[in-house]
Amino acid sequence: MTNLRKTHPLMKIINNSFIDLPTPSNISSWWNFGSLLGICLIVQILTGLFLAMHYTSDTMTAFSSVTHICRDVNYGWLIRYLHANGASMFFICLFLHVGRGLYYGSYMFLETWNIGVLLLFAVMATAFMGYVLPWGQMSFWGATVITNLLSAIPYIGSDLVEWIWGGFSVDKATLTRFFAFHFILPFIIAALAGVHLLFLHETGSNNPSGLCSDADKIPFHPYYTIKDILGILLLILILTSLVLFSPDLLGDPDNYTPANPLNTPPHIKPEWYFLFAYAILRSIPNKLGGVLALVLSILVLAVVPFLHTSKQRSMMFRPFSQCLFWILVADLLTLTWIGGQPVEHPFIIIGQLASILYFLLILVLMPITSLFENNLLKW
């Protein structure tokens, strides 16, 4: 009798994706983050669903409803903090996943990479709108500042902003639509993740060496299922430690003050995972220029495959490119730090230099270094 998992139409899809999938035998723990992102998404959708059962998207009651969830709902505090810190874990995994792709040349799978960039944009949009929902001070002013950036678009800018607001300022209409979008987007992200996997399974996984691994493939199950479970356990350990010991570590104290349009907080800043992009935005003294730099800071990832000048795929055997990669990581950490600092000397100049270096590394220095390494090997 033929095996059901190989013949049943639904089981066959699962089998070919997670059980009998031919996988390179040498992929390291850096390849765990795809499954971790899947787990993060599931956790976010489930906790978000339970939060939505008690949340009200009205300016008068939004803040109170979140307080009610934390105080009166059974384990509401746990659900709320799992959701808030789950977002942080999501972004940590995302950044590591993208970093892995850059280091090992996974971006050479064009379709997979481009869907990934689209996913990054979608997750960032979802997180931004979710941050607005508790209707604290930072929620309100963050929404005001970021949506206002669209007014920099020539000709249609101011009309566009009022259209998004649903009025002349961030108000009830804005909150209601942000809640609607925040609810629907994770399901769109899940669908996109399915397409991401579909394209990945067309080519098969990359591996640390960047070489073709067709001659040495092993089944995904049990080897990588057990490896993924280890990663998932570590993720759960870190997330629960964060939630149970210091749930507000990554949050902003200002968000425990109800939104007040008449009182601006001294330092408006987004969640930590947006600080690098926020620093790039602030480093340009022109509004439109800043908005373009902000968008390009993520969109530049889509250009990376076309700037690959090396004869080798991975950075595993390219020491000079490795140095530049780690400089890029340090630069992003610097930008993250600057994004949380006030706009004053010396932070302004540090932010501007770090922003220039960010684009310079990706667009100029890395491709030139790759060409230099080709000559070094006399290829």
From Swiss-Prot:
SUPFAM superfamilies: a domain/subunit of cytochrome bc1 complex (Ubiquinol-cytochrome c reductase), Transmembrane di-heme cytochromes
CDD domains the record matches: cytochrome_b_C (cd00290), Cytochrome_b_N (cd00284)
List of residues binding a ubiquinone: H201
Family from the record: Belongs to the cytochrome b family.
GO cellular component: mitochondrial inner membrane; respiratory chain complex III
Protein's cellular compartments: Mitochondrion inner membrane
Name of the protein this chain belongs to: Cytochrome b
A matching Pfam family: Cytochrom_B_C
PANTHER family reported in the protein's UniProt record: CYTOCHROME B (PTHR19271:SF16)
General function of this protein: Component of the ubiquinol-cytochrome c reductase complex (complex III or cytochrome b-c1 complex) that is part of the mitochondrial respiratory chain. The b-c1 complex mediates electron transfer from ubiquinol to cytochrome c. Contributes to the generation of a proton gradient across the mitochondrial membrane that is then used for ATP synthesis.
